[in-house]
């Protein structure tokens, strides 16, 4: 009853509702409805149909369904996804209306039975997207929804309901009461009419949908495209209480998006649907053809637009021209209103790209540029000629010019040429002009004119040309530098020879090549017929001023041929030499007689005279003649030296027949009178056809001795009166004979006594020499000559001379001489042999004995070279005296004197130094200008051999050069850098080219830079002097800023170079550091001790230093310097001189490798053993960085570690920022730190390796091992990319190219730090040497190894001479062999000598394992020999 009552109530309510709403169309599916009138239909393209349910006809209807009549879908009876369509009748309503319907969705378990959707199809078009949908389980009741479709006449639409079965397939969907109401919907908003939108392609399209109703009724706003796409609303804006605006935007629409669009609101209670509006997309127009060129000029182009055919939509409302340079980023647009257009203000010779732009209405209506016209303007005449013509370098025969870079604004054409035209005068009279024009390369602003004449005015101008014209620049005049002059013409040399003089005249060179400043004439005797003249003689030089073209050479030897060389000099040096040979005339012989000697004997008819040999002058004596002349009473007597001699031979018989007063009594060949011998005049003998008759007792005679020289038809003779015989009287004849006999006896007695004295004197000299005592040979010679001249004097006079000689022997002995006077006696010979061996095996040179001020002491005797090693070891271990005590003893006397009397001590000190101070010649008007802080220091047996001075300050530079000039110094030794520890230690007192210091002009002639020192050669000229001095400066650059050098190898080589380069007759050697004390003193002591060790086999360092300190204060400043001197002398004695001249290398090497049978060894093996003994061993403290725990894994072996002092610390940052790598910086012969020796990179050090290469600017890598060597504990991996690019930490390594032959693989890499790209890249060439087998100590081929050295050298020159990384397995033996070989080749090229020991020793000072084995050391000799032999075959 209750259910029946409820049903009746529901039916009553429904009837009331229907009566009040009165729908104009629809379907309620009730029993009394005519279903044919409902105008709905089932879909034809769905899966199943809707089921009509009438509950009163179904008694067994499930309780899940409501009662009544409706359409229903049972989800459980259909498959998931199947659809059922219900189509409502087509509607064309012009007024506002509402489509209302009820729906039922229920599932007992709450699952969704499916989805119910509503679609609105317009004008039979596509269904599109659903305008409304619902899903889920909504309970066992009906829900009502509305569709507010805003369509306007004549459009019609049809609503389609769709049920889709869910995957759960449970429950029911129902549809009922589909009614068309003629009033607005209350649950869905109504849209106003939506208008069409037109936009240009690429623009944004905006639809604005205005809806009436409650905005809250709309849960979503959508725009639906007719094809089905859905666009969400961009924004929703309330216009009033019941009106709101939904905006939809389509971005950058294209032609393909042109379609119909409508607005939709959606909610569970219904949807609002607008009419379809069209989106119209217009394509902006673009010309089909490019514009047409009508005419081109240098600054304009005239074109025709050519816009008749277009692509896109019209109408065209604007035309524009867009143009730009084809190579430029900018563009310009000009509006055009005509079919032709002229583009102005264009650049000449420039390519332009010109396009036409067309525009239609609307935003974005401008189309893409049409096809471009590419055209080039013509060239224009150059703006002007190039300016700024100037020289960058002027030499004597070439001129390097530069000018302003030629920009486009100047050339106004890309096709142009620059010609450099020049002219200058030529010919002997400079009456001809040489002209030439050189065409420059493009973009060049620098050019070198070569093959010019020195010291000429060169007139130069630049001409700029292009196809439209040319511009000539102003002519600029330059003057080439001077050059050495040409040679003096040999035919211009004229001369007049005399006996001991030659007059020589010459003319100026035909090619002076500058201003002649000086002539230099050198002459040397090269041949002489006089055996007393030594040929070749010393070479002497005479300098003449530029206006003096003649000279008289005096003090020449007669009969001697001299080679004269004449050369002219300009500011650039001397020119070619003109040579001529001139022979002096022979001169008359000379006699060694003083006053007329007494005859040796005399009788009535004879007289015995002493004939002494004459000295030929220019020619040997050919004949001696004895002339007898009767001394008549009234005859004019001949005076000795002034008389005319007897050129015509005359026998006795001829003289008698002619009545001559003289005759030739004898003619003696020169060979018969080689020493003084008696001759009896009147002995009645015949000599060479001349009778020597007895003299007449009653006549007085003058006896003449004549010598004759004859050479090449030229005869010279000289005579001297040697005796006078008085006439005999009969009464006195016996007495005279008795007197003569007594005189003869006296003479013989005196001669015998003199001979005894002479023998005693010579014996004493021999004894002294054998005892090793020096003898003043000059004085001894004088005494001997004095004795010989006065042989006839008293015998006690001779003994007086001898006692004088003995007194000279007892003179005080010098420091150096004392060592020769020591009591070593018999030990000397053994010491000589030992020291000679230690000094290199060369014979000891002859040492001069000129005295020395170094006085030895008894407490500190000299040390034998053989005992030096033991002595130094004892001193270092503090056994005995010790270095510290010896060093401090140098200053004990100074302290005592200061305590006693400071004023006096200081005054004595000053006066002591002042005695040895260098005093300059005062300048005019400045008497105090004689001071310079410099002292004379004695060398070994050479007084004042050194000048110790301070490094010149700026204000003292002129005084320094005055001293060098005044003292005729040829060598300057500098042992400091200009700046050390941030402080100026010495001013740069020399020029880089040429500079005046006061009145002294210093010119740098040449410079030679080596790894440890530099040699600069200067020419000194002084105003008012014609002489020109050459001075060499030896600048040692390897002395560290603190302490002393780590090893003495380089310093010893430096000292030897200075000694070898200093002429023996030069002035003192100037030595300076900063203060002229410590380092200067070390150098002097080493120089003196090296000479002492070589000459005496001993060294006396202590007394040498002591004496030095008495000459100049603080000559040895620290105990460290004192110890260093000992170590350096020891190294010199152990190693000796090991350099070999290139010319002697082959025989020397052959001797060195010869096996001695007794020792079964060779000199080369012993030299290598010496190398091992002097190689320093590294202590743990010296390798502290390599031994740090964090660095252990970066070492291949803990036995081969680099010392801290040689480490190249890494600069590039990478991760942990560790800056250590197992590598060492080492010198070559010519460059400091030229090599970086390292081991083959490990897997964890590859990045470090490339950091090292980049940080230290290494342009070459030399690899001497093979990859994956089996004898390695770690595999040798490839550490480079090939091909391609690879990153190693911050380093980017790119393989650029490669080449290979049978010996070497060469690869080129580009390396850069990607964290510092602004630094640019580094080009590195990698040389992998293939000919060194894994188990060999030396390369397989010397020739291939030389090939490697040559390739690396060539690349180093091309790449700017960067450092070279050398590596093998452990960075030792092989790497050392390569570095040593490079050094040896540098020695040969620089100095034409090789010193293999020095090269190996230098490298081992950095790493003891360099040149590791005897075979590798031997190979270095082989490489030197191979290279020298290759030079001979070139």
From Swiss-Prot:
UniProt-annotated catalytic positions: 1073, 1368
Positions of substrate binding: 1041, 1073-1079, 1117
Residues in Fibronectin type-III domain copies: 287-382, 385-483, 484-590, 597-677
EC number(s) recorded for this UniProt protein: 3.1.3.48
Annotated glycosylation sites: 74, 409, 684
Region span, Disordered: 824-851
Cytoplasmic side: 770-1434
Segments in the Extracellular topological domain: 18-748
Keyword Disulfide bond: yes
Domain MAM: 25-187
GO MF, any single term: protein tyrosine phosphatase activity
Disulfide pattern: 209-263
Annotated Polar residues bias: 824-839
Domain (Ig-like C2-type) ranges: 189-274
Catalytically driven reaction(s): O-phospho-L-tyrosyl-[protein] + H2O = L-tyrosyl-[protein] + phosphate
Name by which UniProt lists this protein: Receptor-type tyrosine-protein phosphatase U
């Amino acid at each position: 009853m209750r259910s029946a009552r409820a049903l009746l109530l529901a039916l009553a309510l429904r009837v009331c509702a229907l009566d009040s709403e009165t729908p104009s169309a629809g379907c309620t599916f009730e029993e009394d409805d005519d279903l044919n009138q409902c105008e709905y239909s089932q879909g034809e393209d769905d899966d199943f149909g809707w089921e009509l349910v009438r509950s009163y006809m179904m008694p067994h209807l499930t309780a899940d369904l409501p009662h009544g009549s409706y359409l229903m879908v049972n989800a459980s009876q259909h498959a998931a996804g199947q659809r059922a369509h219900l189509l409502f009748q087509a509607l064309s309503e012009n007024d506002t209306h509402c489509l209302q319907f009820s729906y039922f969705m229920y599932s007992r378990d709450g699952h969704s039975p499916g989805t119910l959707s509503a679609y609105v199809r317009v004008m039979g078009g596509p269904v599109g997207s659903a305008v409304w949908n619902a899903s889920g389980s909504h309970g066992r009741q009906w829900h009502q929804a509305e569709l507010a479709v805003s369509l306007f006449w004549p459009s019609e639409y049809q609503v389609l309901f769709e049920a889709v079965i869910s995957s759960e397939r449970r429950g029911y969907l129902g549809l009922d009461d589909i009614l068309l109401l003629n009033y607005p919907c209350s649950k869905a908003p109504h849209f106003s009419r939506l208008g069409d939108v037109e936009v240009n392609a690429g623009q944004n399209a905006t639809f604005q949908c205005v809806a009436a109703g409650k905005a809250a009724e709309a849960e979503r706003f959508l725009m639906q495209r007719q094809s089905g796409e859905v666009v969400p609303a961009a924004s929703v804006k309330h216009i009033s209480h019941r009106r709101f605006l939904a905006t939809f935007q389509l971005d950058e629409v294209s032609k393909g998006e042109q379609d119909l669009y409508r607005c939709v609101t959606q909610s569970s209670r219904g949807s609002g649907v607008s009419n379809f509006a069209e989106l119209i997309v217009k394509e902006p127009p673009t010309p089909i053809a490019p514009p047409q060129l009508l005419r081109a000029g240098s600054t304009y182009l005239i074109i025709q637009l050519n816009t008749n055919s277009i692509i896109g939509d019209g109408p065209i409302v604007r035309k524009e021209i867009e143009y730009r340079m084809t190579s430029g980023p900018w563009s310009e647009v000009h509006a055009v209103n005509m079919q032709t257009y002229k583009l102005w203000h264009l650049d000449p010779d420039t390519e332009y790209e010109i396009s036409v732009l067309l525009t239609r209405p609307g935003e974005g209506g401008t189309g893409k540029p049409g096809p471009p016209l590419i055209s080039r303007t013509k060239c224009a005449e150059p703006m002007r000629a190039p300016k700024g013509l100037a020289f960058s370098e002027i030499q004597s025969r070439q001129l390097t010019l530069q000018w302003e870079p030629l920009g486009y604004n100047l050339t106004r054409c890309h096709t142009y040429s620059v010609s450099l035209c020049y002219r200058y005068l030529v010919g002997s009279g400079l009456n001809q002009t040489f002209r030439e024009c050189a065409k420059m390369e493009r973009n060049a602003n620098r050019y070198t004119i070569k093959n010019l004449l020195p010291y000429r005015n060169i007139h130069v101008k630049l001409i700029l040309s292009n196809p439209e014209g040319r511009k000539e620049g102003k002519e600029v005049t330059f003057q080439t530098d001077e050059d050495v002059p040409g040679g003096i013409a040999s035919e211009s040399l004229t001369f007049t020879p005399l006996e001991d003089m030659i007059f020589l005249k010459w003319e100026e060179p035909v090619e002076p090549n500058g201003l002649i400043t000086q002539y230099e004439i050198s002459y040397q005797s090269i041949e002489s017929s006089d055996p007393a003249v030594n040929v070749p003689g010393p070479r002497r030089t005479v300098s003449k001023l530029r206006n003096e073209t003649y000279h008289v050479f005096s003090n020449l030897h007669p009969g001697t041929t001299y080679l004269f060389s004449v050369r002219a000099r300009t500011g650039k040096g001397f020119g070619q030499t003109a040579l001529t040979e001139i022979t002096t005339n022979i001169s008359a012989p000379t006699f060694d007689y003083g006053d007329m000697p007494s005859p040796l004997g005399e009788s009535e008819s004879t007289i015995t005279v002493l004939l002494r040999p004459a000295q030929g002058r220019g020619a040997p004596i050919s004949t001696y003649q004895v002339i007898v002349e009767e001394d008549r009473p009234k005859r004019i007597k001949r005076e000795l030296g002034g008389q005319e001699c007897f050129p015509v031979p005359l026998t006795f018989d001829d003289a008698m027949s002619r009545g001559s007063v003289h005759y030739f009594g004898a003619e003696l060949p020169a060979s018969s009178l080689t020493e003084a011998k008696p001759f009896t005049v009147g002995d009645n003998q015949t000599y060479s056809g001349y009778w020597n008759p007895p003299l007449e007792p009653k006549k007085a005679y003058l006896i003449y001795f004549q010598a004759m020289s004859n050479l090449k038809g030229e005869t010279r003779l000289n005579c001297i009166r040697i005796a006078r015989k008085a006439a005999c009287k009969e009464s006195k004849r016996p007495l005279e004979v008795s007197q003569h006999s007594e005189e003869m006896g006296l003479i013989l007695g005196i001669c015998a006594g003199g001979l005894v004295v002479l023998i005693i004197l010579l014996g004493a000299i021999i004894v002294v020499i054998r005892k090793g005592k020096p003898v003043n040979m000059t004085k001894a010679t004088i005494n001997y000559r004095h004795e010989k001249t006065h042989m006839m004097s008293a015998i006690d006079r001779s003994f007086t001379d001898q006692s004088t000689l003995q007194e000279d022997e007892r003179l005080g002995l010098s420091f150096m001489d004392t060592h020769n006077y020591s009591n070593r006696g018999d030990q000397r010979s053994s010491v000589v042999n030992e020291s000679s061996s230690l000094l290199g095996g060369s014979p000891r040179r002859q040492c001069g004995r000129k005295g020395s001020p170094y006085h030895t002491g008894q407490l500190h005797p000299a040390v034998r070279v053989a005992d030096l090693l033991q002595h130094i070891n004892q001193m270092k271990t503090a056994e005995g005296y010790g270095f510290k005590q010896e060093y401090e003893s140098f200053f004990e006397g100074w302290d005592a004197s200061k305590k006693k009397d400071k004023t006096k001590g200081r005054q004595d000190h000053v006066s002591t130094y002042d005695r040895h101070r260098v005093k300059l010649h005062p300048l005019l008007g400045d008497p105090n200008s004689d001071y310079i802080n410099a002292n004379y220091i004695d060398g070994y047996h050479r007084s004042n051999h050194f000048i110790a001075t301070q490094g010149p300050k700026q204000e003292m530079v002129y005084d320094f050069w005055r001293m060098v000039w005044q003292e005729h110094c040829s060598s300057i030794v500098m042992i400091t850098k200009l700046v050390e520890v941030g402080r100026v230690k010495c001013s740069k007192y020399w020029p880089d080219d040429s500079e005046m210091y006061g009145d002294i002009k210093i010119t740098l002639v040449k410079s030679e830079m080596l790894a440890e020192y530099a040699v600069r050669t200067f020419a000194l000229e002084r105003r008012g002097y014609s002489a020109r001095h050459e001075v060499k400066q030896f600048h040692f650059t390897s002395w560290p800023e603190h302490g002393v050098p780590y090893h003495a190898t380089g310093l010893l080589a430096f000292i030897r170079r200075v000694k070898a380069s200093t002429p023996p007759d030069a002035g003192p050697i100037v030595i300076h550091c900063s203060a002229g004390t410590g380092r200067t003193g070390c150098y002097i002591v080493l120089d003196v001790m090296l000479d002492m060790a070589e000459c005496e086999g001993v060294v006396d360092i202590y007394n040498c230093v002591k004496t030095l300190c008495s000459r100049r204060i603080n000559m040895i400043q620290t105990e460290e310097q004192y110890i260093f001197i000992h170590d350096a002398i020891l190294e010199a004695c152990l190693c000796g001189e090991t350099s070999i001249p290139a010319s002697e290398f082959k025989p020397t090497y052959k001797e060195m490798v010869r096996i001695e049978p007794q020792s079964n060894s060779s000199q080369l093996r012993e030299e290598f053993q010496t190398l091992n003994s002097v190689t320093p061993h590294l202590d743990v403290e010296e390798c502290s960085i390599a031994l740090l725990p964090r660095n252990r894994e970066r070492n291949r072996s803990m036995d081969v570690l680099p010392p801290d002092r040689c480490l190249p610390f890494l600069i590039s940052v990478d991760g942990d920022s560790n800056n250590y790598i197992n590598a060492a910086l080492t010198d070559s012969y010519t460059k400091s730190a030229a090599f970086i020796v390292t081991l083959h990179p490990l897997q964890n050090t590859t990045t470090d390796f490339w950091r090292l290469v980049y940080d230290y600017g290494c342009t070459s890598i030399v690899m001497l091992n093979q990859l994956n060597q089996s004898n390695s504990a770690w595999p040798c991996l490839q550490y480079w990319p090939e091909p391609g690019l690879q990153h190693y930490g911050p380093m980017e390594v790119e393989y650029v190219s490669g080449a290979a032959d049978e010996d070497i693989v060469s690869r080129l890499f580009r390396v850069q730090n990607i964290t510092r790209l602004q630094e640019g890249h580094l080009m590195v060439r990698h040389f992998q040497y293939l000919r060194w087998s894994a188990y060999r100590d030396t390369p397989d081929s010397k020739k291939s190894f030389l090939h490697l050295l040559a390739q690396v050298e060539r690349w180093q020159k091309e790449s700017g001479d960067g450092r070279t990384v050398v590596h093998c397995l452990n960075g030792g033996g092989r790497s050392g062999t390569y570095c040593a070989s490079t050094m040896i080749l540098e020695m040969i090229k620089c100095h034409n000598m090789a010193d293999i020991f020095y090269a190996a020793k230098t490298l081992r000072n950095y790493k003891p394992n360099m040149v590791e084995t005897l075979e590798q050391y031997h190979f270095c000799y082989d490489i030197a020999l191979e290279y020298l032999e290759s030079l001979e075959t070139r």
